[in-house]
Amino acid sequence: MSQVYPYRLADFLRAQVGDGLRSVIYHDRDEYEVVFVREDVDDYDGAEIDDIVTDLWADSHEQAIREDIRRHGALNCTVWVFDDAIEMHFVADERQGVAVALDTQTFLAQSSFIRQCLGIAGLE
């Protein structure tokens, strides 16, 4: 199992993008932890967060399938682009990862952002 550093990643992101950071969630096979959530987006209830984490677990579980189908090497990050946020799911292994949500404009203003996040999180 890979060593993951979600708090280190959250600290890096707060320093790098400030208020553009919306949330950081760490998950493994059995549980999850909301590492950071910006105050103005802290309106998800427990059931909604459970649903999000269930989706993250499914995404992590599909990592090996995606790697086999595409044959590009290891899948390190999945990115979802929404109107108001861009979510990045840094996949450590089959059921472990860190999900980060940023304001869309914040994400678009960064360069080589995913590579930096992978390194800071210990996933590169």
Predicted features along the sequence, with ranges:
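Non-catalytic interaction/Regulatory regions outside core domains
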Residues: 1-124
